[in-house]
Amino acid sequence: MSRNPSRTTTARQPSTPLSGAEPGDGAQEATAEVTTRRKQYIIGPKQAAGLSPMASETILTALQATPGVQIDGFIQLSRPQVFAAGGLGGRYVKASMPVDRGLQLQRQAMASSTLFMQENVRLQHMSDTVPFDVGSLLPAPAAATAIVPVNVRVLGSDGRPVVNAMVSAYGAGFVQAATDGAGLATLNFFGGTVDDLAALYVKPFADYWERWIPSPSLRSDRENLVTLQPLENWPGANLRRGQPFVGWGERLMGLQGSDASLTGKGAKVAIIDSGCDTNHPALSHIKIGLDLTNLDPNNNPDPNTWRNDVISHGSHCAGVIAGNGNNGIRGFAPEAEVHVLKLFPGGAFDSLIEALVYCVNHEIDVVNCSLGSDQVNEGVAQQMSEARRAGIVVVVAAGNSAGPVQFPARLDTALCVSALGQAGTFPPDTYHAQTAPSQMQPGMTTGANGLFAPKFTCRGREVRLCGPGVAVISSVPGGGMAAWDGTSMGAPHITGLATLVAAHHPMVTGMARNANRAEQIQNFVISLAQPVGMDRQFVGDGLPLFVGHSEPAPSPGIAPQASDLQSIVSHAFDDVLTH
């Protein structure tokens, strides 16, 4: 889950008839009264200990006989040879119906120990449209009033226009616009003035640092200029154009990008996200994927459109996990076999279940899920358990709502990852700086060496590890790079490390694909964690460290700054490298 206000990550509503339409209505009228839309539900057998689940066909027959219910489709859970061996078999039913009918059937399902029925809710990347700590937004006008246009021109420090930057103003409501080819964005304010704004936030699409300007001096009678700095201008980024780039988080964890023996070759990693731009030089080696948001008449995912990443989120995660370093980021496992499963925009619980089924059927080793929901789904939970039984480690972002860990990260079958920031890795006039705690809280949300738990990260006992998640620079579509925040960025760091373990640790070689295999990989990754000096509900066991090309040395109690990493070795991982 990323905090990326430059991209609105709304997903499609689960497929239902148009508003007001009933099954069998036929052609839609050109004009129709707006009514409450029907809802789609996932209905299936519940896997309860000691109980035989209700047969899928029995469920289907009952639904077909219920007035007002439309069968929308099915979710095939596993290939026959998988569930014949003792796993979860059969299929779930997707059905839409009026809200009152859905509530009635849900009450009946809740009383059953062999059946579940839950709404097919859209998943989220949790990209915040309103940053934290902008203060109380002033009330918007009660009715439409005169429009006050305010022009903001965004240029780089070299004078070039910054195209497709998102300019957001917070004050009397919320106003947003994107820059055009000349770097110009027009913010249209409805009534009021522009001298009482709380903040102006400029988020470039790629290659520049963002700007966060509190109490901005905007005027409607002139052009307002905002100048952005290239990413490479900030020394803490350690970025040199045209050279392989290793981010601050990777360096902090011990990845230097120079050890040819640690590439992830032989492991399979899946990225369940928004797709991947394989035209990006750092991602051009990724060849396998499916678009679960684009289905043919036979319900088969499109095998090509996964390369069209309109949200950029999946490409950013892919860079951290498996970037090849070609004019861009060098990720943890550039030679791993990457499977891209596109869920966004449009992903709901049904798509996530289908993606997890794919991972079981294709013997994936590690899965990255930088997504979540504030609602739960039994079907997803059961398929997460099936993935664990198939030997798969599923890494899930904790969430960015600054509250309890979200679903499915809260499941015992997930490796839940929160976000970690470090002072000095971003300029002070960016919103990255605003994510740090307002007050130093040693032992709670702030640790040594400038480490901190960002305000947005979800917290709770379910958090197992933390991962770098503030100002993480990685690949975005079009060949550029961008700095993003979020537990969505923390999770790929842990996914990348787990992929290296799956590829190179001798204990994994030849192991049967079962729950023990997944637990061994996950537990080993957790064993690499070093305390970061903060409360466990924010960071879990800490940040995993490894250095594969240094002499053994005692590990510190607190994660070091990146410059200190040459003197740190995780003894456990060092044992792997000697085999």
Q: How would you describe each model-predicted region?
A:
Residues 159-178, 182, 190-194, 203-332, ...:
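Active-site core segment of subtilase-fold serine proteases
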Residues 281, 409-503:
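Extracellular S/T/G-rich loop segment that most often corresponds to the catalytic His/Ser-adjacent loop
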Residues 164, 318-321, 339-344, 392, ...:
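Hydrolase catalytic cores
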Residues 2-7, 69-152, 170-174, 178-244:
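Autoinhibitory propeptides
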Residues 2-133, 258-264, 268-278:
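Long, contiguous interaction/targeting segments characteristic
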Residues 319, 346-369:
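Substrate-binding/charge-relay-adjacent region of secreted/lumenal peptidase catalytic domains
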